[in-house]
């Protein structure tokens, strides 16, 4: 099927064409709000695992790497949407630092120990792994037949199912917080959810209040959090296992000190040089092999993200060139990220949820969000203002966005007649595949590399189960209406 024709003027619901900046900027910003925290969190976790903490004297390095994470996300997003030769699928996908590699990176630190050299080994492995994924993208076309709508639908559903608990954790204040699930956190999340739903469904569907409902809901929640910070107590007391008590600051409190301390302007650095001289990429086999395996996993997830994005936002299937270019950008974008000292940069399912819910796919709107990310990298003060937003505010929008990804997967599967074959594939993929991968400890007795691929997330086992069953059904059962069509 042909892509949308380019025109001088477009609408928020067409990929190409210009729209007024008063529309494009807020529509782009709501994508940034959805992914901002998730873009930085993996980097903070891995720097901590490597011992690169502020207390250890790496405060300036951490700031520089966080700055680069925002800059890279913006640049790679622009490449994904506009493409440079075969790099980029020209699809409305937002790119960001992947959390899918956390498990394998932690295992690398367990093998190599803490320190800047270990972080450098992670960067070196990412450079090699990203190039490997780029090759997979070039070779994708012959493999496309293994990804019919029932398979991609299962992958998309698994992505949605895996993200829903993440949204709930945000809503409750963030995993590990002392006031997890507090009334204040739930109240903030519900304010965002109610405002978003009200604007989405009770205002002009084509107006800015409806199309930017997620951004407005988040901003309203942010303002409410600031007001609560001004009028309510900031601290509580937790009782430890030994009976002693400890004081803590509530997770919903907005602290502007980080904004005051941040500088107005800073240029990004390159790994191994200048302010990033301590994290020079090194190439260790112990790191490269497991990371390369995870890039295969990332390829499957990116296929699902692109299929969900195009299907839900453009009402058609993704083309071979879109999938191939998207995966090449995923891989080479990750290598580029490592060259700038940060972790793999891949498609963000959170933003697919926004597209599934709003149907807004305009490239100019998403470009405004990408440019804002680059500005955040160049102006740390702007980044700090966004980063101090309470997680419960984001959670109010996230629970709905992530669930909409699940709905997109259902739409992919049900857009053609459902036969017993499709029912079998979906049932086994989600029941055995997703259930096995998402249940803690289910793979704990299996070999290490099996755990690495299938443990901790139901996405990959669901994809493998769906692909294998689809091949078996094609070989040994009579054609379904989908095959004949």
Model features per residue range: what roles?
Residues 21, 47-90, 286-363:
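Membrane-embedded helical hairpins/re-entrant loop segments and their flanking transmembrane helices
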Residues 39-40, 221-230, 240-334, 338, ...:
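Membrane-embedded hairpin module used as a gating/binding unit in multi-pass transport
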Residues 85-86, 334-340, 347-434, 451-453:
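Hydrophobic alpha-helical bundle architecture
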Residues 476-481:
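Conserved small/polar residues in nucleotide/adenosyl-binding loops
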Residues 24-193, 381-382, 388, 392, ...:
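Early transmembrane hairpin of solute transport permeases
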Residues 31, 72-80, 129-137, 156-166, ...:
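Hydrophobic core segments of alpha-helical transmembrane domains in multi-pass membrane transport
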Residues 1-19:
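Short, Lys/Arg-rich, polar N-terminal cytosolic tail immediately upstream
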Residues 54-58, 108-117, 161-207, 234-274, ...:
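Inter-helical loop and helix-membrane interface segments of multi-pass membrane transporters/permeases
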